A protein has these predicted regions:
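Compositional signal for N-terminal targeting/processing segments
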Residues: 1-268
Length: 268
């Protein structure tokens, strides 16, 4: 693999049978929004890959209100983690947007819109957020499960302003990655699930997406991990498959109790 660093945020990966232009964006920067649009229009790729999963894409584009959500359906479908994680992210993003004037993740949706207008197929390359939390949950002890819930609930309902120092740091990361890192500090035993696996999943999804020339838009915090994964795949090294990274181990009965409590905590 040949790696060409076009800038601090744009990297070209030249492989045997494909070319990947990787854009590591700052999710709270207007410059990132314009950069993504310009690169897609200039490069005219045959595929655009973005750092979203199907559930988060729908939550961003359909603008569903939690107030109108059928909580019984959420419980029945076992989507408590998804609801709590999205509540935490939405809260965090609102606080960031209020202080920066830019809606976090706008460049990701912008990439999808530019691609759609140009007739370019889009691949959603991130792992389902619920799968990530369920895998982390399965690796946690009862005490760590409580800490995981506490971290998510705290993020979901916090009104604390982000400091200037924290804001500068966030400009080089994406909000979900920041949330994952925060939980990894509290739960080092599941760092592999929260951080490393997600980089591997993104890297493999981008590598395996159809197309000879692809533009991939991801948070800057993922860049090195994704490049490393793609390099390993291009060299034929053994790396986890997407199926391996989405298997959710069967949980203990106590886990089901928590999954019922999560949506109840949100609406109470």
């Amino acid at each position: 693999m040949q790696l060409i660093n076009i800038s601090d945020t744009v990297h070209k990966l030249i492989l045997n049978d494909q070319e990947i232009i990787l854009i590591g964006t700052a999710h709270v920067s207007q410059n990132s929004v314009e950069e993504v649009k310009n690169i897609i229009e200039t490069e005219s790729p045959d595929r655009v890959c973005i750092e979203l999963d199907d559930g988060r894409m729908k939550s961003k584009t359909e603008k569903k209100s939690y107030e109108n959500m059928d909580i019984r359906k959420v419980i029945k479908e076992g989507k408590g983690f998804f609801l709590l994680a999205n509540t935490a992210l939405a809260s965090f993003q609102r606080r960031m947007g209020a202080q920066t004037g830019t809606k976090p993740g706008e460049e990701i949706l912008g990439a999808a819109e530019v691609a759609k207008n140009a007739g370019i197929p889009v691949s959603l390359c991130d792992r389902d957020i619920q799968t990530t939390f369920k895998r982390a949950w399965a690796k946690s002890s009862l005490w760590n499960k409580c800490k995981l819930l506490a971290t998510l609930i705290s993020a979901a309902f916090s009104n604390e302003e982000i400091t200037a120092e924290e804001l500068e740091q966030l400009k080089s990361q994406d909000t979900l990655q920041t949330l994952m890192q925060e939980m990894a500090k509290e739960l080092p035993m599941v760092k592999e699930v929260l951080i490393d696996e997600r980089d591997q999943y993104l890297g493999r999804s981008i590598f395996e997406a159809p197309g000879k020339k692809k533009v991939a838009v991801i948070g800057a915090g993922h860049t090195q991990g994704v490049i490393s994964t793609i390099e390993s795949l291009s060299e034929g090294k053994q790396t986890p498959t997407l199926d391996n990274l989405t298997i959710v181990p069967k949980g203990k009965p106590i886990g089901k109790v928590f999954s019922y409590l999560i949506p109840m905590l949100i609406v109470l």
